[in-house]
Amino acid sequence: MKQFKQFRTRTVLDDICEIHGCHLWSVKIPIRGKVEEISQCPECEKENIRRFEKQLNMESEVKSKLSDTYEVFARDSIVSSKLASKSLHDYEIRVDIDENAINFVKRLEREYAKGTVGNAIITGPSGVGKSHLTYGLARFLNEQFKSYDEPKSVLFVSVVTLFDKIRESFEFDNGYSEAKMVKLLSEVDFLFLDDLGKESRKADTKRNEWAHQIVFKILDNRTNTIINTNLSSEEIKELYADDFGNGALSSRIFEGATGRCFVYPSGMKDRRY
């Protein structure tokens, strides 16, 4: 500490601060390897320190807010590496229905950006681009809300992988316990569920009831859930009309989705081939 002792010395000058009316101090400080003597007002310096602390606090608040909102998408989404590289910009329009689909998603963009509340559903056969569209929308909304300085928490989750991870958590702590995932998926501002219905098996009633209970817990505590599925509306009602659901779960799935459902024709070709 001895080598810094010289920098703690100060001399009170006759000069007066025009703002605070107090005497200036002459202090010695190291600047770029040299000891420089400068004049400063102690009250001005206090104000500078307070402004600096306020700025640090603001930056800390922004980082904390982004951690709870914008960063959720990249940190907590459950998505394949192949799909994670997709966006709405690289969605290829091959037939008329593709253009209708992209226009539907763009309408969802505008509505959700304006504060619209309610679910949305995209349904159709495998391979028509449902996951690409919904992931692209999730990615776009996440960036859009940040650009408005109103970041939201947006989460995209593969339903099949989600339940695989929850089942794995019964054997070891993988960070995907049922309680943790229900809480996370219930609380995000926008939840995208990829391939809803794939978590269920026709012949496994006990497994289905467990899975349906989890889906119900999630949807019962939230709005703004965007779903893609291979199931038609009638198939959704049939699948989730078990002893537990009794129609309540399918009601949660369709909640607020009037006018926000898009259906691909059943005979469409798989885009992946």
Predicted region positions:
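A short, basic N-terminal segment
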Residues: 1-99, 271-273
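Pre-Walker A (pre-P-loop) alpha-helix and adjacent loop at the N terminus of AAA/AAA+ ATPase modules
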Residues: 90-120
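Short glycine-rich substrate-engagement loop in P-loop NTPases that contacts/grips substrate
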Residues: 99-105, 142-187
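Walker A/P-loop nucleotide-binding motif
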Residues: 116-135
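Loop/turn-to-beta-strand initiation segments
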Residues: 118, 153, 187-190, 221-227
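GG-anchored amphipathic helix commonly corresponding to the ABC/SMC/Rad50 NBD signature/C-loop
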Residues: 135-141
